[in-house]
Amino acid sequence: MYDTSLAKDEFRKWSRSYDKSILQLLLFGPSHRAIIRRLQARFGDSPFNVLDIGCGTGVFAERIRARFPNAEVWGIDLVAAMLDKGRERFQAHDGRIIPIQGDSERLPFANAGFDVVTCCNSFHHYPDQGRAVDEMRRVLAPGGELMLIDGYRDGLWGRLIYDVCVAGVEGEVHHCSARRFRDLFHASGLIELSQKVHRGFAPCLLNRATAPAIIPMPHIAAGVESGHRVMAKSEHRQRN
């Protein structure tokens, strides 16, 4: 069974070659550009803050900062080795990229703190995907947007790429169908769901949804009742 310890071990090994992986060209780069186009359409040159879940070595965080100099980018990753590899990249942005080690299923942030939450090509590694979406939903500000892109496994080519090739290398990871994404988003209370397929050598599905203006009480309490270490962004700055 694929679990957090297996994910940690896999990415610890991958951290040594992650920035030079062919996937940066074939998969990650196109995914990053798709989300940046959406950020541009939504914010233009206005300031915003974003949490990138599964940030790895910070390649995407740096691309966001390059395009949106007024943005504040927070990155969280399960694996310290990934963050260590990106240390110089993070430090080059004068505190406007803030990396934190943590778990997508227990985000160490207060409720409703981010304008945007992004997740690029890491969701299939999350053992409890429903809980991860609930956490993404919890930390979004009312009206904030979740942008989650991952492998598109619907159709013959998608199943071959993700259910056979990727699963053969990475083990028991799970790429969601478009319907499964819709079910997860709706169950978490997200609204205004839209989905767009991005074709290419490795097709991806960009899922977008919005946090409603009123946060249901169960979601407000989730961070504390689940035993999360909830940390407000201002508290982090005071400590550092």
Predicted regions and their residues:
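Conserved class I S-adenosyl-L-methionine
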Residues: M1-G44, V59-R63
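C-terminal alpha-helical "lid/dimerization" subdomain adjacent to the S-adenosyl-L-methionine
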Residues: Y2-S5, I22-Q24, M147-N207
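A generic alpha-to-beta junction signature in SAM-dependent methyltransferases
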Residues: F43-G44, R67, L140
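Class I SAM-dependent methyltransferase SAM/SAH-binding core
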Residues: L51-I53, T57-R106
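A short acidic, Gly/Pro-enriched loop at the edge of an enzyme's catalytic core
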Residues: E105-V116
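A short SAM/SAH-binding and catalytic strip from SAM-dependent methyltransferases
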Residues: V116-D128
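A short glycine-rich, Lys/Arg-flanked "PGG" loop and its adjoining helix->strand segment in the class I
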Residues: G130-P142
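Core SAM-dependent methyltransferase catalytic element
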Residues: L190, S194-K233
